[in-house]
């Protein structure tokens, strides 16, 4: 997800503010007008984003966001309290718990049948339904001032710059920890994401992600779990896609107090250390030490595949909230 783009963050901040004003509007015309401004900001933002990132945002609003909306209804809470200064560049996941219910509340105002449309699968996202339902005659007459736009732009520039600086510092601190380092290189058999905590992870840019609580991976060669310690993953896909969903090519743990316990039984290798376990088939274990002692886990190269064979793919992802 492109978190470090100041223009995208500017659009997201203006969209959130427009939603705040729509929810606060006492009458239908004001709500329709500011909801329209929010959807305009969203369309412009989504047009500049990778399709996978757009789908990620819509999917989470439709699932996590609607779950929050239903919880608000059950507890008789009023409209969601969206932050006046918007959401930060690295709080995309957090934002869906406010923006999703906000879109649902506005749909309640403009389309009494929207829940039926969602249940029937005729809408891909809450924002798409709202865009269709807004009355054109009531959607004009409000806009952000030039000063408001410039203020949002300046703040987004500062926030994304801080994000990039913080990422570099966190990555450097991870690799600077004294102690043993464990590196697992999956090679041509990427490790599939089976469990993770989306609220306790940090995208470092490119295909690197720093996991701060939970990570579960597996492939046709075994399984591994990291719990209550940090681990850094490098995704198998270095393009514009999600850095985890194509699988993990390399996993690194740093700052281990001692070498992991490694036991073998036939072709199976079991690796254990504080906060980490792995059971792997056919793995090779190599220890090197040039300043930092590194335990490297690899596999022998695959034999040449037969003609027409399909390369291995990583299993599908699951989060700890599934």
Model regions and ranges:
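Post-HExxH zinc-binding segment in Zn-dependent metallohydrolases
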Residues: 1-80
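Active-site-proximal alpha-helical
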Residues: 51-149
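Non-catalytic terminal regions of proteins
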Residues: 112, 116-322
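Non-membrane alpha-helical secondary structure
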Residues: 8-15, 30-31, 95, 99, ...
């Amino acid at each position: 997800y492109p978190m470090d783009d100041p223009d995208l963050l500017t659009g997201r901040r203006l969209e959130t503010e427009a939603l705040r004003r729509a929810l606060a509007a006492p009458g239908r015309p004001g709500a329709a007008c500011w909801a329209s401004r929010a959807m305009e900001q969203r369309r412009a933002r989504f047009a500049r984003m990778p399709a996978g990132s757009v789908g990620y945002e819509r999917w989470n609003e439709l699932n996590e966001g609607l779950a929050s909306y239903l919880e608000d209804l059950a507890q008789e809470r009023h409209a969601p309290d969206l932050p006046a200064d918007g959401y930060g560049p690295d709080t995309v996941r957090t934002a869906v718990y406010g923006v999703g219910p906000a879109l649902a509340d506005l749909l309640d105002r403009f389309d009494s049948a929207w829940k039926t449309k969602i249940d029937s699968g005729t809408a891909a996202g809450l924002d798409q339904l709202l865009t269709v339902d807004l009355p054109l005659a009531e959607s004009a007459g409000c806009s952000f001032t030039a000063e408001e736009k410039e203020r949002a732009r300046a703040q987004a520039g500062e926030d994304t710059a801080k994000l990039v600086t913080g990422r570099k510092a966190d990555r450097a601190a991870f690799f600077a920890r004294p102690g043993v380092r464990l590196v697992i290189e999956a090679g041509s058999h990427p490790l599939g994401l089976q469990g993770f905590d989306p609220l306790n992870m940090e995208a470092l840019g490119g295909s690197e992600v720093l996991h701060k609580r939970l990570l579960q991976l597996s492939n046709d060669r075994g399984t591994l779990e990291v719990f209550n310690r940090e681990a850094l993953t490098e995704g198998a896909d270095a393009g514009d896609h999600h850095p985890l969903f194509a699988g993990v090519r390399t996993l690194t743990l740093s700052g281990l107090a001692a070498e992991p316990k490694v036991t073998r039984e036939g072709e199976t290798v079991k690796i254990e250390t504080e906060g980490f376990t792995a059971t792997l088939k056919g793995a090779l274990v190599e220890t090197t030490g040039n300043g930092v002692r590194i335990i490297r886990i690899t596999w022998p190269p695959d034999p040449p595949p037969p003609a027409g064979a399909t390369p291995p793919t990583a299993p599908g992802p699951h989060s700890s909230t599934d």
